[in-house]
Amino acid sequence: MKKNNFTNEQMKDILELYNSGNSIYAISKLYNVTHKVINRIIIENNLIKRDGRKKHFYNQTIFNNIDSPEKAYWLGFILADGYINEKKAFMRIKLQECDKNHLDKFVKFIDGDKGMIKYETHNITYNKQYYVEVNGREFIKSLNNHNIRQGKSSKEHIAKIPFEYRKDYIRGLFDGDGHIEEKRIDLVGSQEVLEYVQRYLKETCDIHVNRILEHCNTKRIYIGFNRYKVLKHLYYDECISLDRKYKMVKLLLQVAMLKSGKIGSDSLNI
C-alpha cells in the first residue's frame, strides 16, 4: 500500500500509533508497507522523530517472544558478549575482524541493514574491531525483560527460555564467553549462569560439572572428559553459531572419531 492509498482515518491512526510510542517498524508491519512509507508520513505531518541516535530500521520487537532457536541463541550471545546502555537506549556487539560475518548474521536476524555494521581501530594493536550498535528503547526494554541489563559483567541473570531452545541459548553463551580447545572447554560467567549450565548438562546429557571456580571477578567451569559429548550436543549440524567455533568443534569431533576408530558411531563419548 502506498502513502496516497491510505484513508484519512488510517493516516490519523498511524500518527496516533507513533505518538503512543510504537516504532516505525512495528507500524509498517501492521499496515504491510515499508518503513520508508511510514517515515515519510511522520515527516510530512511535522512530527518530531524519537530517538535521534536511531538511523537504521530493524525489528525492535524481535525478542518479545523467544520462540525459535535463533532468538534463544542471540539472547545468550548478547548476555555473554553484548554491551547495553539503558540511559541512552542502545546495545552494542563488538567483535574482532575475523568474526565480522557474525555481525552480518545478527543484522539479518533483526531485519536490519549492513550499514549498521561499523569498525574502529584498536589504539594499541591497530587491528580493526567491527561492531553493530542497535538503538531503540523498545528493543532495550525487551532485553531487560529477559534479564539482560547494563553493567551485567559477573552479575548475569538467566532468562526464562523454553526447554527445547535451551541448548541454543547455552551455545550463545559459549560463543560469547566460552573457550574451546582439544583437551577441555570452559565457560566464564556468573554463579547463576554457570549453575544453570550445570543443571542443563546433568538433565540432558547426564554430565556432572562439579566445581565452579573463581576467575578474576567472576566464575568459570571446565569440562574435560565429557567435552566431546557437550560439543556434539550444543553444536548440532547447521545450527546458528560463530563460524570460527563451529568449524573448530566439527574438526575436534572428526579427529576424536578418527582416533577412536568409531567413525560414524554415536557410541563415542561425544
Label every PLM stretch briefly.
Residues 1-270:
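Internal intein/HINT superfamily modules and their associated LAGLIDADG
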